[in-house]
A protein has these predicted regions:
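Surface positions of alpha-helical coiled-coils, especially the charged/polar e/g heptad sites
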Residues: 9-12, 16
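Contiguous, amphipathic alpha-helical segments that mediate oligomerization or scaffolding
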Residues: 16-52, 57-63, 71-74
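Intrinsically disordered, low-complexity regions enriched in serine, threonine, proline
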Residues: 12, 25-27, 32, 47, ...
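Acidic, low-complexity, intrinsically disordered interaction modules
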Residues: 62-172
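Acidic, low-complexity intrinsically disordered segments
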Residues: 2-9
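Ampiphathic alpha-helical segments that act as solvent-exposed interaction surfaces
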Residues: 153-197
């Protein structure tokens, strides 16, 4: 069997290290430019106003979409494919800003104490499929749920109040009866507040 020689000279290693460092610096510059755009789009808003717009969704997405359409050359320069790609960066900057200013309480499913039939109800809702993060954050006395989902190389964030998180979830509304939806919402709120305390 032929062995492949994987040894490199000092010059080759130095060149590869320099190329790697250059790529890291280019990505840092790219992210800094995107962060500047985030500040330009949402910087004049308070965190609570940003939170309201994020939950409302339409006005949040409209700002992002309008900026993308008006700055297509810049988007291409930043290797942004489409509005969704651009929006994912804006969403991540906002979530990071929330985390930097408020305490995120991890909702640990190990604290979930339910009979099997209720666990099946939660699974039937499909709300937590592809979940990679679930937190409770309290802003000005109101409890919110921050839901992170990942799949196919994309990360999405959804936020709603602890009271509305389940009842407004499209998957839960589609997959559960009205009575089951109410039961699920009550159980989830109890679980979330238990994790908080």
């Amino acid at each position: 069997m032929t062995k492949i020689n994987m040894t490199f000279s000092e010059e080759e290693l130095a060149r590869m290290a320099a190329e790697f460092e250059q790529k890291i610096n280019e990505e840092k510059e790219r992210l800094a430019k995107l962060k500047d755009i985030y500040t330009k789009l949402f910087g004049e808003l308070s965190l609570t106003d940003k939170l309201a717009k994020f939950i409302e969704n339409d006005s949040w997405v409209k700002r992002i979409s309008n900026y993308f359409k008006a700055n297509r050359e810049l988007m291409a320069e930043l290797s942004i494919i489409d509005v969704t790609d651009f929006g994912s960066y804006m969403d991540e900057f906002f979530i990071k800003e929330l985390k930097d200013n408020f305490t995120f309480v991890d909702l640990n499913f190990d604290k979930l104490d339910l009979p099997d039939e209720d666990i099946e109800l939660w699974e039937k809702s499909t709300v937590f499929w592809f979940t990679t993060g679930l937190w409770l954050v309290t802003v000005e006395g109101t409890d919110y749920i921050v839901h992170e989902l990942s799949g196919q190389g994309e990360t999405l964030y959804f936020i709603n109040t602890v009271d509305d998180f389940i009842v407004n979830d499209p998957n839960a509304k589609r997959n559960l009866s009205a009575d089951d939806l109410t039961k699920f919402a009550e159980q989830f709120k109890e679980f979330a507040l238990k994790c908080k305390n």
